[in-house]
Design a protein with these regions (language model features):
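Short conserved beta-strand and strand-loop elements enriched in small hydrophobics
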Residues: 15-21, 50-63
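Short, surface-exposed secondary-structure edge patches
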Residues: 8, 42-48
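Short, charged/polar, Gly/Pro-enriched secondary-structure boundary elements
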Residues: 89-94
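Short, solvent-exposed secondary-structure boundary/capping segments
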Residues: 40-43, 76-86
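Short beta-strand-centered aromatic/proline hotspots
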Residues: 29-30, 65-72
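N-terminal helix initiation/capping motif
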Residues: 1-34, 96-107
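Short, conserved beta-turn/loop elements at beta-strand boundaries and strand-helix junctions
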Residues: 22, 36-37, 73-78
Length: 107
C-alpha cells in the first residue's frame, strides 16, 4: 500500500451503495471504510484503475450521485475490492457528502 492511500484517517463502516458504471450497468456493493476524500468498496470485481463510477447510498440521509474514480484495486484472498477517490463536486454535493459522512461514522 502506498503512503498516499493511508495519509488520511479512515472510519470503518458497513454501508450499502449502488455503483453505476459508465456503461449504465449497476450493482450493489458495501463501503468498508470511508473518509471525506474517498472510500473502499468491498467485493467489487472487474473495475480497473482510473475507471469512474457513480455512487448512491441507501443509508439515510441518502447520498445522491457522487462520482468517484478507482485509484487502486485489491484482489487478494479474503479481500477484494477497489479504493475510490471522490471527484470534484459543487457546494450542494459537498454539503450532502459531509452530512452523509457524519451520519455513517456516527459523528
Amino acid at each position: 500500500m502506498s503512503d498516499e492511500r493511508r495519509s488520511s484517517a479512515r472510519w470503518p463502516v458497513a454501508v450499502t451503495v449502488k455503483v453505476t458504471l459508465q456503461n449504465g450497468h449497476a450493482f450493489d456493493s458495501n463501503i468498508l471504510n470511508v473518509n471525506l476524500g474517498g472510500c473502499f468498496l468491498g467485493e467489487v470485481a472487474g473495475l480497473r484503475e482510473m475507471d469512474v463510477v457513480l455512487l448512491h447510498s441507501y443509508y439515510n440521509p441518502k447520498l445522491n450521485g457522487i462520482y468517484a474514480q478507482v485509484i487502486w484495486v485489491v484482489e487478494e484472498p479474503g479481500l477484494r475490492g477497489v479504493g475510490v477517490r471522490f471527484q470534484p463536486m459543487d457546494d450542494a454535493q459537498k454539503f450532502e457528502l459531509v452530512r452523509w459522512f457524519n451520519q455513517v461514522v456516527g459523528r
